[in-house]
Design a protein with these regions (language model features):
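Glycine-rich active-site loop/strand segments that organize a redox cofactor
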Residues: 47-96
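Flexible, glycine/proline-enriched loop segments at strand-loop-helix junctions
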Residues: 69-73, 100-105, 166-174
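Predominantly flavin-linked oxidoreductase catalytic cores and closely associated redox partners
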Residues: 108-109, 116-234
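Glycine-rich FAD pyrophosphate-binding loop
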Residues: 5, 21-47
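An accessory alpha-helical subdomain
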Residues: 78-87, 97-121, 234
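Residue-level recognition of phosphate/Mg2+-coordinating polar/acidic sites
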Residues: 22-23, 37, 58, 81-84, ...
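Small-residue (primarily alanine) positions within well-ordered alpha-helices
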Residues: 12, 16-21
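Beta1/beta-strand and adjacent pyrophosphate-binding region of the FAD-binding site
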Residues: 1-12, 30
């Protein structure tokens, strides 16, 4: 029996597990998640509403050293594919402008339908499992786990295929702490410098301090030597 191990139990890891199990029902699929629950970051996405996708999906929406890479990714999928995936799971989707949300308006609905499908497909789920090392062995891999400070991690399983779905580095509390980059490096992949794409603005002695945490439309202008060099609205 083919064994596919998926490192990371966020939305990408769960989606990968669902797709793998549906495409090959005979395969053994295992999700290895280092948090005590799956999809923890889903629950805070979109202020708890979970924006699933955006109908305005073009390379201009992204910044990259290689625009061709962005184009290649976009060409392989679409927002319609995303809607179809979730509706097939039993999740009605609604549009608000270009944004797509679960009709319930609750991120918990997304997590609920995904975990239900994982159970239906018989996907194995291992929580509180911190993967420290993945070693190529023959045509497969040995997967080792332990704590971040563990000097002698233990092998927990062998796998024929491994999918890294660890997320980025944007939300350590929810699980995206950058450990996936280290695992990718161990296979010889090159990681470009990681920078945040969405950050808060810190100001002093301003009435905006009282508005901390409030989300609203606005316009930002960047001045250099008294001249506007860039403006953006959103």
């Amino acid at each position: 029996m083919k064994h596919i191990a998926i490192i990371g139990g966020g939305v990408s890891g769960m989606a990968a597990a669902i797709a793998a199990a549906e495409q090959d029902p005979s395969a053994r699929i295992t999700i290895l998640e280092h948090k005590p629950q799956l999809g923890k970051k889903i629950l805070v996405t979109g202020n708890g509403h979970c924006n699933l996708a955006n109908t305005h999906l073009t390379p201009d929406c992204y910044r990259s050293e290689d625009p061709r890479f962005i184009q290649a990714v976009i060409q392989k999928t679409s927002w319609q594919d995303t809607v179809r995936f979730f509706e097939d799971l039993g999740l009605p989707v609604r549009a608000k402008g270009n944004y797509l949300y679960p009709r319930s308006g609750q991120a918990s609905s997304v997590l609920r339908v995904m975990t239900r499908r994982l159970k239906e497909l018989g996907v194995e789920i291992c929580l509180d499992t911190h993967i420290t090392k993945i070693i190529p062995k023959g045509t497969g891999f040995q997967i080792h786990a332990g704590s971040k400070t563990c000097q002698s991690p233990k092998k927990i399983c062998d796998a024929d295929r491994v999918i890294l779905a660890c997320g980025g580095k944007a939300a350590p509390v929810q699980g995206s702490d950058g450990t996936g980059y280290d695992l990718a490096k161990s296979f010889g992949h090159t990681i470009v410098p990681v920078v945040p794409a969405l950050v808060q603005l810190k100001v002093e002695d301003s009435p905006f301090v009282k508005a901390s945490g409030v989300r609203t439309d606005g316009k930002v202008s960047v001045y250099v030597d008294g001249k506007v060099c860039s403006e953006d609205s959103g």
